[in-house]
Amino acid sequence: MTLITHAKRAVRKPGHRRPLAVAALLALCVTATLITLVFRAAHGPPAAAPTIDLEEHIREYIRHFPSDHEYRIPDAAQRAQVSEGIADIVDGRLDAAGRPLSEAGYTVRTVRLAGSHRMVAQVAEATGRGAQPRGWGEVFVDLGRRVQWSAQVPHPVSDQHTELLGAELFSRAPGGVLVLAGANRDAGRGNAADVAHRQDSVFQAVCAALAARRIPGIQVHGFADDSSPGNDVVVSAGPGEVGPGVREAARSLSSAGFTVCRAWDQDCGRLEGTTNVQARTAAADDVPFLHVENSRSVRDSRTARSRLAAALAEVARQLAKGGFTAA
């Protein structure tokens, strides 16, 4: 009997310890839950990315462009900082981009384009107390896929509605970058703010960083109707080789109903873009570049502008697929 009793007691001992183990486990779970709740209460839920109507944003943005002589030429360090930040974003290092951009007086945030699920990085000049108008522009980078093309707007306001054309083009074709100058081309002393013809601008620093990564550019401009009579659009490669992308762009625009002047075999009224700094940079890097001049009549018509953006967006999609080469 004594042996049996001891044996029964030996069997019961693990059973006595099991409730203690369960209680300890429950205590750990409760503690972990409390810690999680406290952390969430302190930091709040992840903030949803703000939605931005790109066209409305740009319309408001250009209203606050610098006045005459307020444009400031960025120094070499500032241009390098912006270039580094944009390169970080394009290379998928969004978190790393904040430091160099902030050093140049820029902010970066993620926004969602209205009417879509596309998330983009918005790079903008810092505002608030002490901020001075500089006119260096904004950049939008598609975060949904690898960057493969860019829309460039060097003369917003001066070439009226090219800023809206660039915005619609960027919105229609994924995988792009929108590079928007931040001042009227006459806002600086001399041609200081004419970023299409200056090496020392943030605009050029960004476009050069993209060209260094072999990202093609579509740059939109505007001309007075009487500068190239009878033409809606003038297409060229600037000083670069006229490759398949440039020729295909001309065909696409013609198919969309526009009268297209092909600068490589027609007299288009000196609108070829041969002195364009971004075009020269792309040519030096053997990167496809499309220089598109648009008549005032086309730019002033919302319908025509949308048809133009749709045709250029198809060219951008082909660029993204690697369908064209520089030569």
Q: What is the predicted role of each segment?
A:
Residues 38-288, 295-326:
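N-terminal catalytic or cofactor-binding beta/alpha core of small enzyme domains
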